[in-house]
Amino acid sequence: MDTKKDIKSLNLEELKTELESMGEKAFRAKQMYEWMHVKLVRSFDEMTNLSAKFREQCKEKYEYTCVNPVRIQESKIDGTKKFLFELSDGNVVESVWMQYKHGNSVCISSQVGCRMGCKFCASTLDGLERNLTPSEMLDQIYAITRLTGERVSNVVVMGTGEPMDNYNNILKFLHLLTDENGLNISQRNVTVSTCGILPRLRQLADEKLQITLALSLHATTDEKRRKLMPIANRYSIKELMEVCQYYFKQTGRRITFEYSLVGGVNDTEEDARELIALAKPLCCHINLIPVNPIKERDYVQSDTKHIQAFKNKLEKNGINVTIRREMGRDIDGACGQLRKKFLER
């Protein structure tokens, strides 16, 4: 039996081609695309300006992907909501909805699990199950929009998974997300986080998208980075910085370096000096992250005073730096924690 095509992963031109092959006029594709990506309906049956016969034909030919909420947690501290969504094959992924003064932000997953093995991340503990499709990534956002009744203005691909390990689907997702015929979210309001698969980053640079690239650095020497991130066994920091220069040259977009502060591991004065030396030649921003403790690892978070002192040292040397605001700490807010607890139940 042939696998049905995933209709929500098609762009408008691809959808036109599909529907024309069924004998429909091009305007039908525009109508259907609006139902899927603007009105965010959950089934063909809700597309009321399409004939019942045509809707039945679509059901037979196409898969209509929707994620289903199985658990929702809300922070009593800041109103952050964490969603655990079930996929059509029974796998689960997590997403986070956060409220800021500038608007609502959603953090989505790009894979079921992760194979990158970063030592301070819960989402990698059980390895990689599979990649998410463009529609499964989109519907995390669509489902949260439906459930909260509020518009999403910013999207962060920083949940479970390594986006560059799912490159083709991520690229398709980004184009669908920012399409003027769909949600029309500005590329500048989209952030993609990566541990740094360098050939893929070069490819992404050549796309010249205006998204924000957030690169997980977390250490200032290859020796330290290898202890925290297995990807550092493949690519050196020198190679990483060269690709960052290329990315900026191609896109004109400042890189964000994510730097998780682990007590006694990468938060010393020497680490600060080395980070300054790495950052100065680049157009970049440093985002300091108080590491989230997970029970399977013995890493501890740097204390607040230490984090502030680290930040001050960078600022005094002209480095653009912030400390990430901790959201949802009372609801398994760290990446992968809610999914892991659900699977262990």
Question: Where would I find each of the regions flagged by the language model?
Answer:
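Conserved AdoMet/S-adenosylmethionine-binding subsite of the radical SAM
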Residues: T145-N154, G159-N317
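Phospho-regulated, low-complexity intrinsically disordered regions of nuclear gene-regulatory
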Residues: E86, M98-Q99
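Canonical Radical SAM [4Fe-4S] cluster-binding loop centered on the CxxxCxxC motif
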Residues: Q99-E136
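Conserved alpha-helical substructure of the radical SAM core
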Residues: T124-N154
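Short linear Ser/Thr-Pro motifs
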Residues: S75, S109-S110, S123, S193, ...
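A short loop-to-beta-strand scaffold at the N-terminal edge of the catalytic core in hydrolase folds
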Residues: V92-W97
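Auxiliary Fe-S-binding modules of radical SAM enzymes
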Residues: M1-N91, Q245-R253, Y259-R345
